């Protein structure tokens, strides 16, 4: 039950990441923001979190603060709830969305450590927790269209409901240990610290690969709806279908990738995912119809998330003594890097076209594919790498 509650909060937390992207077309249509301006809102959701995420990871490693996931969830919800209310002021929107981004950043390290504690560290079990996030992102566009369609941008206030309701459920289920200190990095079940060194070089290469993933994810989330509107002159409601399909396909990719990683090897899955994602991005750029955009977006979501769980577990194997920091970088900092690039992508979209943005994304994914060949597998049983302590039967426990 604890893992189900935690997974539900992951869905709620990442719902607010999806809500940012879903709100962008309405800021363009109702508040007359430029593409560069809405890309700046994406930056707001990620800029401060790019600094805060490793700090939250360090705090999780050092102090095991379980309550930080709940506090982060509530902050994420509050920021998005306020964003539509203050839409007349770009600075105010930027500020409240930044608060939401910090909340999302605070959630991930603590929640990932708890999920690992509950369900172990295999790619398969990790993928299940990650799917909670995919589900939340997928539900966000429909929820945003519903509340904004009925009440205008001020209807964003209703978007705080998932954080309050699911946060309350989690607090009740986890009340006995919510404010207790988690065992940092679960070293009790591992080998002595001296025998499990951190491999910072490998982790740096993984971070470089993830940076290309981040730009692809944020770029697609920011521009896929706007692309359909610009190229095919469809309404915001129809355009949002692709935005829902993207994370829904990502959920399929996450589960499939986790299963394949445990059977075929993580690096094979990582490389296959980047290659598929690059091809799908080119298909989006040259799609002849809105339906073709949706189909290509589904392929992109699947390919982009095939490596997701593998990348998380690789980060844990590279930094076995700093699980919180590894999670913070894998799930947060790399995503934030995409947000930092988003204003540049928005400027390109204003000056050229959104099609140009997707061609750039395709090139970056090919760069990620090439960089993935530098990565090394750290297999359980190595004298330097402890086997993750996993309870494989717990399939429901456990991002981006």
What annotation goes with each model-predicted range?
Residues 18, 46-54, 138, 247-255, ...:
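Residue-level signature of mid-helix packing/kink "hotspots" within the transmembrane helices
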Residues 129-176:
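Helix-loop-helix hairpin linking two adjacent transmembrane segments in secondary transporters
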Residues 96-132:
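Cytoplasmic helix-loop-helix junction between adjacent transmembrane helices
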Residues 52-64, 253-265, 349-350:
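Helix-to-loop junctions at the C-terminal end of transmembrane segments
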Residues 74-88, 276-288:
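C-terminal ends and interior cores of transmembrane alpha-helices
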Residues 261-311:
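C-terminal transmembrane helical hairpin of 12-TM major facilitator-type secondary transporters
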Residues 66-69, 270:
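Primarily marks hydrophobic transmembrane alpha-helices of the MFS/SLC 12-helix fold
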Residues 20-21, 202-251:
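Extracytoplasmic gate region of multi-pass secondary transporters
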């Amino acid at each position: 039950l604890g893992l189900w509650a935690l997974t539900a909060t992951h869905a709620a937390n990442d719902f607010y990441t999806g809500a940012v992207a879903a709100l962008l077309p309405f800021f363009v249509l109702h508040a007359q923001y430029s593409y560069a301006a809405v890309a700046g809102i994406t930056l707001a959701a990620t800029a401060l979190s790019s600094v805060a995420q490793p700090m939250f990871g360090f705090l999780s490693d050092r102090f095991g603060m379980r309550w930080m996931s709940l506090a982060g969830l509530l902050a994420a919800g509050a920021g998005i709830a306020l964003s539509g209310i203050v839409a007349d002021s770009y600075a105010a929107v930027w500020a409240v969305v930044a608060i939401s981004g910090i909340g999302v950043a605070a959630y991930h390290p603590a929640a990932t450590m708890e999920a690992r504690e509950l369900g172990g560290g295999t790619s398969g079990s990790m993928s299940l927790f990650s799917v909670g996030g995919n589900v939340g992102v997928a539900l966000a566009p429909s929820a945003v269209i519903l509340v904004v369609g009925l009440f205008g941008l001020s209807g964003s206030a209703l978007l705080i409901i998932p954080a309050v309701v699911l946060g309350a459920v989690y607090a009740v289920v986890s009340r006995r240990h919510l404010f207790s200190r988690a065992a940092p990095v679960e070293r009790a079940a591992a080998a002595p610290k001296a025998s499990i060194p951190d491999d910072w070089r490998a982790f740096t290469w993984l971070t470089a690969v993830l940076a290309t993933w981040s730009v692809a994810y944020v770029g697609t989330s920011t521009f896929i709806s706007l692309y359909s509107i610009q190229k095919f002159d469809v309404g915001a409601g129809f355009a949002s279908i692709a935005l829902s399909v993207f994370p829904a396909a990502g959920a399929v990719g996450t589960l499939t990738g986790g299963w394949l990683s445990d059977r075929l090897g993580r690096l094979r899955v990582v490389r296959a995912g980047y290659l598929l994602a690059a091809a799908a991005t080119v298909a989006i750029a040259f799609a002849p119809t809105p339906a073709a955009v949706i189909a290509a977006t589904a392929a992109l979501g699947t390919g982009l998330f095939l490596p997701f769980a593998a990348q998380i577990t690789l980060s844990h194997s590279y930094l076995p003594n700093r699980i919180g920091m590894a999670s913070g970088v894998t799930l947060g900092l790399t995503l934030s890097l995409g947000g930092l690039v988003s204003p540049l992508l928005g400027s390109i979209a204003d000056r050229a076209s959104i099609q140009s943005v997707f061609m750039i994304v395709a090139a970056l994914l090919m760069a990620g594919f090439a960089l993935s060949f530098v990565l090394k597998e750290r297999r359980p049983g190595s004298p330097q790498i402890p086997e993750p302590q996993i309870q494989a039967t717990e399939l429901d426990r456990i991002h981006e």
